[in-house]
């Protein structure tokens, strides 16, 4: 998950793996062990004065981040599920320099990670689902942006091919009671939170939107 910068159906709420990795430990190509985490400005200054290999890597990457800061900010796309390429934009964070963010998603090309310290989130007590039916795939795509404005925890697409395959499979056939007719596409929308009443209102808002 760290190597791929993975994210799942609830990334709309919780983000990607890189948003939760605090520290990484592992080995460089030289077999030298490392531990990368957030460095305060004073810690970074001390690191920049050392001459060991790990410190030299931090020095080089820090200088690249400073030199190309404007270009990185300008060119890196601001999209929710951007998991391709190296996370150079993670080096421009204002709250501290952390090289761990660059390793996330690098698929082992920069180092071998053996341990990760990650942040955790509480699981919501309540969740409700709304299943939106569409007569065309394009209609479902046009509806996704307004649906996201309702701040759901998840929005998942199932097209007609997937629904038909499920109907042909005895293991899933009896679990499709929520599918009405023969839609070309479904958007399955989840709302979650600590109280059920606001979530039911969200479902009402979703129904009005549809």
Which stretches of residues belong to each language-model region?
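FAD-binding subdomain of flavoenzyme oxidoreductases
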Residues: 1-138
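Signal/transit-peptide handling
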Residues: 89, 132-155
């Amino acid at each position: 998950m760290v190597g791929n910068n993975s994210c799942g159906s609830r990334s709309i709420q919780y983000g990607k793996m890189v948003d939760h990795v605090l520290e990484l430990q592992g080995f460089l190509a030289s077999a030298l062990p490392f531990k990368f985490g957030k460095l305060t400005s004073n810690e970074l200054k001390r690191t920049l004065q050392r001459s060991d290999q790990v410190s030299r890597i931090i020095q080089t990457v820090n200088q690249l981040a400073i030199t190309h800061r404007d270009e990185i900010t300008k060119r890196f796309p601001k999209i929710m599920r951007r998991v391709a390429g190296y996370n150079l934009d993670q080096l421009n964070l204002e709250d501290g320099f952390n090289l761990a963010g660059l390793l996330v998603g690098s698929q082992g090309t920069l180092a071998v990670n053996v341990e990760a310290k990650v942040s955790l989130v509480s699981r919501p007590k309540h969740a409700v689902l709304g299943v939106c039916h569409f007569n065309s795939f394009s209609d479902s795509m046009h509806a996704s942006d307004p649906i996201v404005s309702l701040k759901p925890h998840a929005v998942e697409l199932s097209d007609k091919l997937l629904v038909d395959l499920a109907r042909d499979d005895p293991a899933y056939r009896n679990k499709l009671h929520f599918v009405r007719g023969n839609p070309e596409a479904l958007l399955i929308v989840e709302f979650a939170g600590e109280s059920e009443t606001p979530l039911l209102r969200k479902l009402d808002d979703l129904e009005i939107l549809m």
